[in-house]
């Protein structure tokens, strides 16, 4: 019996897993074997009847699908609307619970991730356009029975506490919650514990991602030039409970708001054997939930 967050569900964003359609059964069996109850699915997977059948066989739920919004400093690129609509159509067919919006990555912010105030900034009008874009497609998702949240993300135009606040204040809180990715929040200079207190029940989805202090400091100093290199070559993100994240304190704070959504373990890349990192994360998460 869990002492903390008894209604919350544990899933995985399996970026550190190597998916091939020819081994989907093995892939899903491995995820289920670690005890994960849900996953982030891709558009390809959402559109595959065979994959959805295998998910049901392994009792894995389509917890979320990610929707990246291409942006300039003046807001979303209008040509991306058809892609967003397609993502929602596939998510609906797959029975996805949560649509996770985020601004797509950009090379200019990749070079200043973690020190975003020194980089290019989205304009006030751009924030307003982005808010309307998210609301438009969150409404479409709601019509299809899908919840929505927005994910502040390092190396994008919405990374920091300030940028998140500006955007979220312009978005209908009944329509779009906050997806708190604690790893990206740390990279952006924020404190996840404070974020829980600041946003409270507006946090409807959580990505559990931990951060290597050593790699982060090298990225902030410029020794590692971009976040992409920090993630892919130096493994900026580490298994939950092994880095800067105060995992137990996070769960204590979420408990104050009776959080009952998904806790999604995520590690963008990991040292081999990369899939084993997810096993470390879920065991540390379970221990912190006691």
Segments from the language model and where they lie:
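Acidic/histidine-rich catalytic cores of soluble enzymes
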Residues: 132-238, 244
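C-terminal/domain-terminus segments
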Residues: 260-288
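Acidic-and-aromatic substrate-binding clefts and catalytic sites of carbohydrate-active enzymes
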Residues: 18-22, 38-51, 70-82, 154-160, ...
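A short, acidic, amphipathic alpha-helical segment used as a generic capping/interface helix at domain edges
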Residues: 242-256
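N-terminal pre-domain/capping segments
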Residues: 1-98, 124, 132, 142, ...
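Conserved beta-strand positions in the central sheet of alpha/beta enzyme cores
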Residues: 40, 64, 100, 149, ...
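Active-site acidic/histidine proton-transfer and metal-coordination neighborhood
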Residues: 78-178
């Amino acid at each position: 019996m869990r002492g903390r967050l008894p209604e919350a569900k544990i899933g995985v964003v399996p970026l550190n897993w190597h998916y091939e359609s020819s081994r989907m059964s093995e892939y899903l069996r491995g995820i289920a074997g670690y005890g994960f109850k849900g996953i982030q699915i891709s558009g390809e997977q959402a559109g595959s009847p065979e994959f959805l059948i295998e998910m049901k066989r392994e009792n894995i739920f389509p917890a979320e699908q990610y929707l990246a919004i291409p942006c300039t400093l003046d807001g979303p690129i209008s040509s991306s609307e058809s892609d967003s609509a397609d993502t929602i159509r596939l998510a609906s067919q797959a029975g996805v619970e949560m649509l996770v919006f985020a601004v797509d990555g950009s090379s200019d912010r990749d070079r200043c991730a973690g020190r975003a105030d020194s980089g290019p900034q989205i304009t006030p009008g751009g924030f307003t356009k982005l808010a309307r874009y998210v609301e438009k497609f969150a409404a479409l998702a709601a019509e299809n029975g899908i919840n929505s949240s927005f994910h502040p993300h390092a190396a994008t135009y919405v990374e920091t506490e300030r940028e998140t606040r500006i955007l979220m204040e312009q978005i209908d809180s009944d329509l779009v919650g906050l997806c708190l990715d604690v790893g990206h929040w740390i990279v952006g200079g924020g404190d996840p514990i404070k974020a829980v207190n600041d946003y409270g029940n507006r946090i409807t989805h959580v990505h559990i991602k931990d951060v290597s202090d050593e790699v982060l400091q090298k990225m902030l100093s410029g020794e590692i030039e971009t976040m992409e290199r920090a993630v892919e070559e130096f493994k900026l993100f580490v298994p939950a409970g092994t880095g800067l994240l105060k995992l137990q304190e996070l769960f204590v704070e979420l408990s104050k708001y009776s959080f009952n959504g998904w806790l999604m373990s995520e590690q963008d890349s990991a040292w081999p054997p990369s899939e084993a990192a997810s096993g470390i994360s879920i065991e540390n998460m379970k221990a912190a939930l006691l």
